[in-house]
A protein has these predicted regions:
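Flexible loop/turn segments at secondary-structure boundaries
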Residues: 1, 20-21, 58-60, 119-123, ...
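Short secondary-structure boundary/capping segments
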Residues: 6-11, 27-29, 129, 173-182
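Conserved SAM/AdoMet-binding glycine-rich loop
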Residues: 147-196
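Canonical Radical SAM [4Fe-4S] cluster-binding loop centered on the CxxxCxxC motif
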Residues: 103-140
Length: 196
């Protein structure tokens, strides 16, 4: 994120679900205590995965690459570690009651993330490299989530989302379940990002 450091107060390095609550709690606590922006940024920098550029001293080599990277305040980590959800069943925050717009949206469907990451490693795909390792969600939990989200939203289509949906090891099982379970409601199934 360093090329954009002058324009942002902080960056989150990793998958957002791991830090949302801690970051918002720190913000609310700082606001309630009457703390300054600097106070909040110092507290935020102590949350794993948060990079606050103003709290680091960075020097560059002649070619523009980073030569050194050091925190300027006590309590700020030497290295900002990328945060990942490793256990997609334990730590995944499934949004079972998504916002349903009052107008027809282009992507008017339930999105069910079946896995994160990709096994392919295609050189042209940044996401496939950035979101490693590949992590699957449990098929039984996916079935329950699909049932709940379709009932609560009234959508007539469900997208089985991932970087490469065809690589999900239980794809046949979840697709057959959706066909059988929602046959009477005529729910459509979308499979984006198929690699065959």
């Amino acid at each position: 994120p360093e090329p954009l450091a002058e324009f942002f107060d902080l960056f989150y390095i990793g998958e957002g679900e791991t830090v949302y609550d801690a970051l918002f709690d720190a913000y609310k606590a700082n606001k309630k205590a009457g703390g300054s922006r600097s106070d909040f940024l110092l507290k935020a920098a102590q949350i794993p995965g948060i990079y606050v550029p103003s709290l680091y001293d960075i020097t560059y080599k002649e070619d523009g690459t980073i030569e050194s990277f050091h925190p300027t305040c006590e309590g700020v980590p030497e290295k900002v570690e990328k945060q990942l959800i490793i256990d997609m069943d334990r730590d995944y925050n499934n949004l079972e009651t998504p916002v349903v717009p009052h107008i027809k949206a282009t992507q008017d469907r339930v999105t069910l993330e079946i896995q994160r990451g990709c096994i392919r490693g295609c050189r042209f795909c940044q996401a496939g490299m950035v979101y490693r390792p590949t992590r699957e969600r449990d098929v039984e939990k996916l079935k329950e989530s699909a049932r709940t989200m379709l009932q609560k939203t009234g959508h007539e289509e469900i997208s089985l989302s991932s970087l490469s949906s065809s690589d999900y090891s239980h794809l046949k099982e979840i697709v057959n379940f959706l066909i059988d379970e929602f046959r009477d409601e005529a729910v459509n199934i979308s499979l984006p990002s198929l690699r065959i």
